[in-house]
């Protein structure tokens, strides 16, 4: 509660600044740029990081590329195209992650009124760890999308046993990727939503909604902060709390069919949650 009170006081101070003090100043311009990109999270970010530094790390555009995304690409250029690399060197968490994902998916796929088993899309796929262990055993075909060409090249050999079921590899950043309209029974988005700004995550979820077949579902699985929003300087990602995440989901035109916390991870880890989402047009 103390944190929440401080947060509201901080928000009130910034609102006064917006309205009265610096509408035409450089600080207002920087503040407005960050707020445009992180409209749900920016006040939490500003509480932890000075305005000018936060702008330089996120919304500043250099050589046509927003620094929030440029810095993430630099980070992943150094990540090996292995299962260990995909798990951030926490390979011991891979098996409990896969098992929980399989069990969660099973609740929403197959049978009347559920998603079909035709085609799945693996977003932020890396080398295809989730595709190999979770999606390919269930779906007739799978597509992968990732911004790193090196990961997708490795995926072709990593998934070689199932190569006849891999429909295509898309080398795109998710903020630039549009799923085919009405094509997918399941769109899987794991450990990648934090690499999108609030603005781009909202837009991407909306495009994914349009990519679903009738009764299709989006499975969103990611770290969820206990409170507020946390910016990781090392890999240029944000971890949002449940309120922020659910607000973005709602604004994207999706509703939560079910949610479940990942079990079997060490207590010191940031909590990981799974969400099953579908279009509010079918509610």
Curated annotation (Swiss-Prot):
The keyword S-adenosyl-L-methionine applies. Belongs to the methyltransferase superfamily. NTM1 family. PANTHER family: AD-003 - RELATED, N-TERMINAL XAA-PRO-LYS N-METHYLTRANSFERASE 2. Keywords: Methyltransferase, Nucleus, S-adenosyl-L-methionine, Transferase. Gene3D superfamilies: Vaccinia Virus protein VP39 (3.40.50.150). This is N-terminal Xaa-Pro-Lys N-methyltransferase 2. Alpha N-methyltransferase that methylates the N-terminus of target proteins containing the N-terminal motif [Ala/Pro/Ser]-Pro-Lys when the initiator Met is cleaved. Specifically catalyzes monomethylation of exposed alpha-amino group of Ala or Ser residue in the [Ala/Ser]-Pro-Lys motif and Pro in the Pro-Pro-Lys motif. Predominantly functions as a mono-methyltransferase but is also able to di-/tri-methylate the GPKRIA peptide and di-methylate the PPKRIA peptide (in vitro). May activate NTMT1 by priming its substrates for trimethylation. GO terms for molecular function: N-terminal protein N-methyltransferase activity. S-adenosyl-L-methionine binds at residues 124, 129, 146, 174-175, 190. Its EC number is 2.1.1.299. It catalyses: N-terminal L-alanyl-L-prolyl-L-lysyl-[protein] + S-adenosyl-L-methionine = N-terminal N-methyl-L-alanyl-L-prolyl-L-lysyl-[protein] + S-adenosyl-L-homocysteine + H(+); N-terminal L-prolyl-L-prolyl-L-lysyl-[protein] + S-adenosyl-L-methionine = N-terminal N-methyl-L-prolyl-L-prolyl-L-lysyl-[protein] + S-adenosyl-L-homocysteine + H(+); N-terminal L-seryl-L-prolyl-L-lysyl-[protein] + S-adenosyl-L-methionine = N-terminal N-methyl-L-seryl-L-prolyl-L-lysyl-[protein] + S-adenosyl-L-homocysteine + H(+). One of its GO terms (biological process) is N-terminal protein amino acid methylation. Its main location: nucleus. The gene is Ntmt2. It is found in: Nucleus. It comes from Rattus norvegicus (Rat). Pfam families: Methyltransf_PK. GO terms for cellular component: cytoplasm; nucleus. SUPFAM superfamilies: S-adenosyl-L-methionine-dependent methyltransferases.
